[in-house]
Amino acid sequence: MNKEQILEAIKAMTVLELNDLVKAIEEEFGVTAAAPVAVVAGGAAAAEEKTEFDVVLASAGAEKIKVIKVVREITGLGLKEAKEVVDNAPKALKEGVSKDEAEEIKTKLEEVGASVEVK
């Protein structure tokens, strides 16, 4: 039996027959099919695009009062809490947000002179 004949035989098998074949090969040769699959899955996970981002206020810049107002609008914090966040920059403003939301927040803050990082 050559390689092509083996492949044709495998193509003709049902899922249950393939499952039995894999188990028989594992037993016969003392290997597991799970190890290579886990390695491939791990590589694929690393290649996936990041979906959650953190918005970090790096510095307030010259227009601190305007930045405090925008921080209040974004976070829903009170005046005192928003001022503390701005005074203690670099500070995370929002964590685990979508890329679009992170870019929107970054744009709002940069418009009033703040320096912002999206991580």
Swiss-Prot record:
Highest rank taxon of the organism: Bacteria
CDD domains named among the record's database cross-references: Ribosomal_L7_L12
Keywords: Ribonucleoprotein, Ribosomal protein
Transmembrane domains' residue ranges: none
Pfam family, one: Ribosomal_L12_N
GO biological process, one term: translation
Molecular functions (GO terms): mRNA binding; structural constituent of ribosome
Gene Ontology CC entries for this record: cytosolic large ribosomal subunit
NCBIfam families with a match to the protein in the record: L12
Known function: Forms part of the ribosomal stalk which helps the ribosome interact with GTP-bound translation factors. Is thus essential for accurate translation.
HAMAP family to which the protein is assigned, alphabetical: Ribosomal_bL12
Family statement drawn from the similarity comment of this UniProt entry: Belongs to the bacterial ribosomal protein bL12 family.
Oligomeric and partner information: Homodimer. Part of the ribosomal stalk of the 50S ribosomal subunit. Forms a multimeric L10(L12)X complex, where L10 forms an elongated spine to which 2 to 4 L12 dimers bind in a sequential fashion. Binds GTP-bound translation factors.
Record's protein name: Large ribosomal subunit protein bL12
Taxonomic lineage of the native organism: Bacteria, Bacillati, Bacillota, Bacilli, Bacillales
